[in-house]
Amino acid sequence: MKIPFFIQEFTQEMENAVLDTLRNEQFVGGESVSKFEDEFAKYIGTKYAVSVSSGNGALHLSLFALGLSDNSKIITPTNSFIASANCIRMINAKPILCDIHYEDGNIDMNSVNDSADAIIPVHIYGNPCDFDSVRIFAEEHKIPIIEDACQAHGAEYKNKKVGSISDVGCFSFYPTKNRSEEHTSELQSRAYL
């Protein structure tokens, strides 16, 4: 039996929109991108959204925007796509890997003993992490939270969409994610970075 990795389902309306964009707009950016950014920001519940090339790019850009750099210590869980830790190394910062909850695969803040300059919790497999424990830790240490919501489009934590409940939320639309749009990603923010 052949089991597809993902199923491509395109409506005629979707195909027409792609062709219209290719024929009438610039290849990168343009009216469709601006419209998507605005609509996705409204959907998530943030004021700002910026399209970038990948989830890794969104995470990387968020670290720069928050002023993190060499020798910053940034907490992230062990159970994630490599981009969560790679973006930290890309700015010459130190990833502090922490354990996860066995039950849901998300970050276990009880395993964090180190102080840090930021934290990147990951909402894994569309399942929000225990964000209250993340927020308490961040507030106690006065550090920013960058949500890796690359696998959690539309997931909610206490009636709020993930990606909107921290300083910055990062999403990926890679074809293997639970929501795909060619190869683009979004960086969400409540404040102008």
PLM-predicted stretches and their roles:
Residues 147-180:
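Conserved active-site segment immediately N-terminal to the catalytic lysine
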Residues 1-26, 31:
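N-terminal "arm"/small-domain region of PLP-dependent enzymes with the aminotransferase-like
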Residues 26-73, 87-91, 97-99, 160:
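Phosphate-binding glycine-rich loop
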Residues 182-193:
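Single conserved hydrophobic/aromatic residue that forms the stacking wall/gate
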